[in-house]
Regions:
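Leu/Val/Ala/Ile-rich N-terminal alpha-helices, chiefly Sec-type signal peptides and the beginnings
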Residues: 2-5, 14-88, 92
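Charged linear interaction tracts used for macromolecular binding and regulation
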Residues: 82-175
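Low-complexity, intrinsically disordered regions enriched in charged/polar residues
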Residues: 19, 26, 33-40, 44, ...
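Structured alpha-helical bundle/scaffold domains in large eukaryotic membrane-trafficking regulators
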Residues: 62, 92, 122-125, 191-194, ...
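Preference for long, well-ordered alpha-helical segments
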Residues: 165-203
């Protein structure tokens, strides 16, 4: 205490919080896998989109299940393409030629995606048949495929906008941009399936 009567003794420093450990790559992988659905949950999720889904447990099942998955996707997208073809017919009959070429371009992009669903890439199929997958890997691809299937409803929503835009050129162009973006993104996501097998052992 000084001559003024004030206590100049230093107050204790506030406690320093302990430094938080930076999670390692292994910690992050463990956290990701901890949030994966169980194998049965993941299988049920995709089976809700693909009736009679065989699953990917064995090589024979994989060939069947992959074909089932592609068939359902192709069928859903073909229905969207049929609606797009009817829009082309409607514009042609009405003599509305401004948007006709754009609709036709969108249809051809969608047709290429449908063809890809119908015909599996040989190199991808060979890897898919042979790669060894445990329950965690199976759950991961089931979850991924279920997410892909969940995107198909967006195509149907986009087609409603296209159909509503047939009398408004600006609306039609905007709707087609959205449809084209969906087509490109779905193609990219489906292409990404093959990377789920990167680093997995083969016999």
């Amino acid at each position: 205490m000084d001559s003024t009567g004030q206590d100049n003794s230093s107050s204790p420093n506030p406690p320093v919080p302990a430094a938080q450990a930076v999670p390692t790559f292994g910690d992050r992988v463990h956290d990701f896998e901890a949030h994966l659905p169980t194998l049965n949950q993941a299988l049920s999720s995709i089976a809700s989109f693909v009736p009679g889904f065989a699953g990917y447990k064995t090589s024979e099942d994989r060939r069947i299940a992959d074909k089932q998955l592609r068939a359902v996707i192709g069928e859903r997208l073909s229905k969207v393409k049929d609606r797009l073809d009817r829009v082309v017919d409607s514009l042609s009959r009405a003599g509305t030629l401004d948007g006709l070429a754009l609709v036709d371009q969108s249809g051809r992009r969608l047709e290429r995606l449908i063809d890809r669903m119908r015909f599996a890439d040989y190199g991808y199929a060979a890897v898919f048949d042979r790669v060894q997958m445990g329950d965690a890997e199976l759950a991961r691809i089931y979850q991924y495929d279920a997410a892909i299937m969940g995107e198909l409803g967006k195509f149907e929503d986009a087609m409603i906008e296209v159909e509503q835009g047939t009398t408004d050129g600006a609306h039609l162009r905007s709707a087609l941009v959205k449809l084209d973006a969906l087509t490109a993104e779905f193609d990219r996501r489906f292409e990404g399936r093959k990377h789920l097998f990167d680093g997995l052992p083969t016999p």
